[in-house]
A protein has these predicted regions:
Chain A
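C-terminal boundary and immediately downstream tail of ABC-type ATPase nucleotide-binding domains
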Residues: 2-3, 242-267
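ABC-family P-loop ATPase nucleotide-binding domain
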Residues: 1-24, 264-267
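ABC family nucleotide-binding domain
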Residues: 15-241
Length: 267, 220
């Protein structure tokens, strides 16, 4: 199925996997989210772009309970509405986390555990799935990202790109409904970015539902079904990547895209 | 008596008192103290205000009063309110409390030194706070706390000499008794110092070995 087909298929099909409405968040005097809406359909890849401080990471972290918005409503898979006006219970936050998995900017692998133990920790000890099954699945996932020979290595023995691929495998092993990527390549040396983006692109093509915060516009254009441009805590513009990248409707979007794609123009 | 002979005749009983008094006293107190320290550190960083405040007061009292005074309060003070504790339990009690207070700050700092991303990665894998602490945070904090806790332990070994003042027959009290008989204070106390030094040297070697072991998984 081509990308455009898939996109049409998802946006028109059944209820969304996740909706966030009017998310507000303030850190001290700094209002980072000023009413953000986001809708995510099953099998869809939504990419958040925007300048640093625009609130895109905060939006992402609100989706799995790492941040608690001050106001707004979140609905996950037709479940009960989570209204952030009252702080969500522990149980609610756990429910959010159980459905999703996250890949971090700085991989956040557990340094005292081997690669394989990083991957199986969640499935084995939290989800309490049978060890044989978990091991087989973990090895399969490591093989597919080309890291079979690293299963007994410790994270510090790997390159940045390898670490991040383990980070992705660790997330996949949890079998989440929703994958969250928080600037997965921003901390990598430029020559290592590709190997990580290729893996993420493959997952997108396979139909994983994901929200990706990134500065890699070429990746967004290739892999996204839907792109949100955030600036100053609001969604300035959103739409399919072709539209947003080739014919941005807003001056702010245009300026941002120009700055990223032709950084020397303003000099 | 020749000084060398006195040294030879006193090092035996002094070393023996080290083995039967100082070392067990330090070891037992350190183990109890570590348990207290871990508990106090967790209370101190907990979001529960009362727990945190209790830990804070405990740490403050331990660090803010002399160990000798703590020891005397327990051994000589408690009997006046009807609680009589023998020398050994008194000493273990006081030293454990002391290690607990100092160790709590060490462990708290070590826990806080583990990057926030580690908590977040564990949470997003579905782990709760307790599991995150035991599986992810404490193993990493352990490595960080080895050098400062070794310091605490070495200090403790030397501080056990204070127990001689509440009649525990440990290394220093034995030395005092020998000195009182022989009147050769210099030789006897230097012998005692030598034995303390040897014990602490061994502990330092142990610290090095432990650090190397825990360093296996960490890039330096």
């Amino acid at each position: 199925m081509s990308h455009a087909d898939r996109q049409r298929a998802v946006r028109s099909s059944a209820p969304p996997l996740l909706t966030a409405r009017e998310l507000h968040k303030r850190f001290g005097d700094n209002e980072v989210l000023k009413g953000v809406d986001l809708t995510l359909y099953r099998g869809e890849v939504v990419v958040l772009i925007g300048p640093s401080g625009s609130g895109k990471t905060t939006v992402l972290r609100s989706l799995n309970g790492l941040e608690t918005p001050d106001a707004g409503v979140l609905t996950l898979d037709g479940g009960p509405e989570i209204d952030f006006v009252t702080p969500p219970s522990k149980r609610t936050r756990f429910a959010l986390r159980d459905r999703s998995a996250m890949v971090f900017q700085h991989h956040n692998l557990f340094p005292h555990l081997t690669v394989i133990n990083n991957v199986i920790e969640g499935p084995l000890r939290v989800q309490r799935r049978p060890k044989d099954e978990v091991m087989a699945e973990a090895r399969g996932l490591l093989a597919r990202v080309g890291l079979s020979d690293k299963e007994n290595a410790y994270p510090h023995e790997l390159s940045g790109g390898q670490q991040q691929r383990v980070g992705i495998v660790r997330a996949l092993a949890l079998r989440p409904d929703l994958l969250l990527f928080d600037e997965p390549t921003s901390a990598l040396d430029p020559e290592l970015v590709g190997e990580v983006l290729i893996v993420i692109k493959e997952l997108a093509d396979e139909g994983w539902t994901m929200v990706v915060v990134t500065h890699e516009l070429a990746f967004a254009r290739e892999a996204a079904d839907h792109v949100l441009f955030l600036d100053g805590g609001v969604v300035v513009e959103e739409g399919p990547p072709q539209q947003l990248f080739t014919a941005p409707a807003h001056e702010r979007t245009r300026r941002f895209l120009t700055r990223i794609m032709r950084p020397l123009d303003g000099v | 008596m020749d000084l060398w002979e006195l040294f030879l005749s006193s090092i035996g009983p002094i070393a023996l008192a080290g083995l039967t008094g100082t070392i067990p006293l330090a070891l037992i107190s350190f183990v109890f103290g570590l348990v207290l320290a871990l508990g106090a550190a967790l209370m101190r960083i907990s979001e529960h205000r009362i727990l945190s405040a209790v830990a804070r007061v405990y740490i403050s009292i331990i660090r803010g009063t002399p160990l000798l005074v703590q020891l005397f309060v327990i051994f000589y003070g408690l009997p006046s309110i009807g609680v009589v504790v023998d020398p050994w339990p008194s000493a273990i009690f006081a030293f454990s409390l002391n290690v607990g207070g100092y160790g709590a700050e060490v462990i708290r700092a070590a826990i806080l030194s583990v990057p926030k991303g580690q908590w977040e990665a564990a949470y997003t894998a579905g782990m709760g706070r307790t599991r995150t602490l035991t599986r992810i945070i404490l193993p990493q904090a352990a490595r960080v706390s080895v050098p400062p806790l070794s310091n605490t332990f070495i200090s403790l070994v030397k501080d056990t000499s204070l127990a001689s003042l509440i009649l525990v027959s440990e290394l220093f009290r034995t030395a005092q008794q020998i000195a009182a008989f022989s009147y050769k204070f210099m030789v006897v106390y230097l012998t005692a110092a030598l034995v303390y030094w040897v014990i602490c040297l061994v502990l330092s070697l142990g610290q090095d070995a432990l650090e190397k072991r825990l360093d296996r998984h960490v890039a330096r």
